């Protein structure tokens, strides 16, 4: 085993950051390209192929750390790792290896915007931890508004956002009166019955019971009838 190669991880990462090819690095380490490839895997270093015929100027990761920077998450992740800006480990679970190999890492954008490469918005996560984030694969982007609960005007139970009353409080042909009081309910129920009270007050039997319970917190059966 070439322990001398393992001991030169930072130096190798620096050469890669400078844009040196694998062939050049292999010559500098006095090893073959295949040997270099094997040790890069052990060191957890990923090399992005570059076409230096068209661009000889290497840009470091720090040049892309702003909102709207034109670089893919994959390339920026590799630059961050190769330049040693972050250690090769998941920032959530802390794993560095899996099955005796460097654990695969993905670049997480905390706000869900893959173009926002500000440093505080970035995190290196393993695929499992990344999949559990609320913005993974574009989920919930811009949906962090507080949920508004709509309630029935009569019994105050939760209903859909477009409705004004629940089904029990809106029987066909009956006019809703949201101002029904506890005294009215107790009067009609104690003197007659729930059915008579529902007809007099313009609310279904079930709706009237729910209305009474929501206003008093008591069981509707607690109303005693006057004989």
From Swiss-Prot:
GO BP term, example: regulation of DNA-templated transcription
Keywords, in A-Z order: DNA-binding, Early protein, Endonuclease, Hydrolase, Nuclease
EC number annotated for this UniProt entry: 3.1.21.-
SUPFAM superfamilies: C-terminal effector domain of the bipartite response regulators (SSF46894)
Inducers of expression: Expressed in the early phase of the viral replicative cycle.
InterPro entries, per database record: HNH_nuc (IPR003615), Sig_transdc_resp-reg_C-effctor (IPR016032), Tscrpt_reg_LuxR_C (IPR000792), WH-like_DNA-bd_sf (IPR036388)
Entry's Gene Ontology molecular function annotations: DNA binding; endonuclease activity
Annotated CDD domains: HNHc (cd00085)
EC top class named in words: hydrolase
Gene3D superfamilies: Winged helix-like DNA-binding domain superfamily/Winged helix DNA-binding domain
Protein role: Endonuclease that introduces double-strand break into pseudo palindromic 17 bp DNA sequence yielding 1 bp extensions with 3'-overhangs.
Protein name: H-N-H endonuclease F-TflIV
Organism (species): Escherichia phage T5
Gene symbol of the encoding locus: hegA
């Amino acid at each position: 085993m070439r322990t001398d190669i393992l001991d030169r991880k930072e130096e190798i990462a620096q050469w890669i950051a400078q844009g040196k090819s694998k062939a050049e690095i292999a010559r500098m380490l006095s090893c073959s390209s295949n040997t270099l490839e094997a040790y890069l895997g052990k060191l957890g270093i990923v090399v992005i192929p570059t076409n230096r015929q068209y661009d000889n100027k290497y840009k470091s990761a720090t040049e892309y750390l702003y909102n709207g920077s034109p670089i893919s998450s994959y390339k920026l992740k590799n630059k961050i790792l190769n330049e040693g800006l972050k250690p090769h480990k998941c920032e959530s679970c802390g794993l560095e290896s899996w099955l005796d190999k460097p654990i695969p890492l993905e670049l997480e954008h905390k706000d869900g915007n893959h173009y926002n490469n500000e440093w505080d918005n970035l995190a290196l996560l393993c695929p499992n931890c990344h999949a559990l984030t609320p913005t993974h694969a574009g989920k919930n982007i811009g949906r962090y508004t507080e949920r508004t609960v709509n309630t029935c005007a009569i019994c105050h139970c939760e209903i859909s956002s477009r409705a004004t009353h629940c089904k029990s409080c809106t029987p066909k042909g009956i006019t809703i009166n949201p101002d029904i009081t506890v005294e009215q309910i107790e009067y009609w129920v104690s003197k007659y019955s729930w059915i008579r009270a529902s007809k007099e007050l313009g609310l279904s039997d079930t709706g009237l019971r729910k209305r009474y319970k929501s206003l008093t917190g008591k069981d509707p059966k607690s109303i005693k009838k006057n004989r």
